Amino acid sequence: LLNKGYRPYTQQEAYQKALRFAGDYVIIHLGLNDTDPRAWPNYRDDFVRDYLSLIESFRKANPRCKVWVCRMTPISHRHPRFKSGTRDWYWMEQALIEEIARIAGATLVDLQEGLYDRPDLLPDALHPNAEGAGILARTVYGALTGDYGGLQLPAIYSDRMVLQRDQPLPISGIANQGEKVTVTLAGQRKETVAGTNGKWTVTLDPLRVSGKSYTLTVSTPSRTLNYRDVVAGEVWLCSGQSNMLMQVGGLKDKTLRNTPVPDQIRLFHVWTEPTAAPQEDFKNAYSVWVKTDASNIGQ
C-alpha cells in the first residue's frame, strides 16, 4: 500500500488495469507487505494518506462505486520476522485500517477473524491455502450481498440447556445483514438487527432458579429456532488434562459408578476432536445438552 514501501500497489500494472476497469464494487485488501522493515519503520506516517488517496482514485474512476476496506488476514507466529517488529507493526496497521474505513465512509470487512485461529491454513505463515481462500471468499461474499446463510446460533444452544442464573444473559448468533432478530424467553422479548458482518447480540434480564422450564425462541422473518426445556441454574465449565478425560464408566469403584444421579443435573459433553488450533465453535452433532442418567453419565 505505501507508495514508498516494498513493491507499491500503485506502481503495478494491476492497479492501472483496475482503474481502467472502473468497477462498481471495489474491495481493497492491502497492507501485509507494509509490515516489511523496509517500509513501516520509515514510511508509516504516510499510510493513512496513501490509503485514502488510493480509495479516492477508484472513486474518481467511477464516482458511483462502492468501496469495502478489509482488515488484513493474519500473520502467523511462524513468520521469520514475527517477533522482530512485524507483529507490532501489523496491529498498528489494523487499527489504522479501521480508522481509514471510517474516514472514507467505506464498509469494513474483517478478513482476520476467519483465519485468526487457523494457522494451519497459512502454510507459509502469510498466504492462505485453498481452504483458507474459501473462508475469505465467503466472508467477502457475505459483506457484498449481506447473505450469511440466514439465522444461526452456536452449537452450545440446544434443547435442555442450562442458562446461568442471576446474571444478564447475552444471546448471540448470525443472521443476514439487516435482518430483524427477535428473542423471547420467560416473558421477555428483545429485538435487534444483524450488523453488516451478520452478527447480532441481545441481552436478556437475569433469570432466577424456579424449577420451571422455558422455551427460548429466536426468530427472523425467514426462520425460527425453538429451544425447549431450557432452565436457569448453575453452569460449571469442567476442563483440564487426563483427569478430565477419565470417564465415570471406567472407575473401579462400582459403588461410585452406580450411584444414582439427581435428575436436576444436565450435561453438555464436548466430544474431543483433534485440531491444529483453538476453535470458537464445534461441529460434532453428538454434543447436545442431556439430562444425566445411567445411560450417559458414564461416558
Task: Map each language-model feature to its residues.
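Extended, solvent-exposed functional surface patches
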Residues: 234-299
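Structural beta-strand segments of beta-rich domains
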Residues: 159, 167-171
